[in-house]
Amino acid sequence: STLPQIDSKTKLQEYSLKKYKELPKYTFYKKTGPQHRPMFKTDVQIPDSKIMIGIGTSKKNAQQNAARKLLDFLNIL
């Protein structure tokens, strides 16, 4: 049987809590695009790491993309 996939945001949260005893910090800072198809921009940061930016069709989607980029940068994927 295959294990259920853990989403990037959850994976980053677990990593950050285990290593730093802190949650990742997400900052929503921009909404662009037309009203019917907005794009959201969010960044994420954990201690001792660079800030990664995620873009998505919702705030949640943007956070997932930012978390995935940071996990990728940290070679945790």
Functional labels for PLM-detected ranges:
Residues 1-77:
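Double-stranded RNA-binding/processing signature
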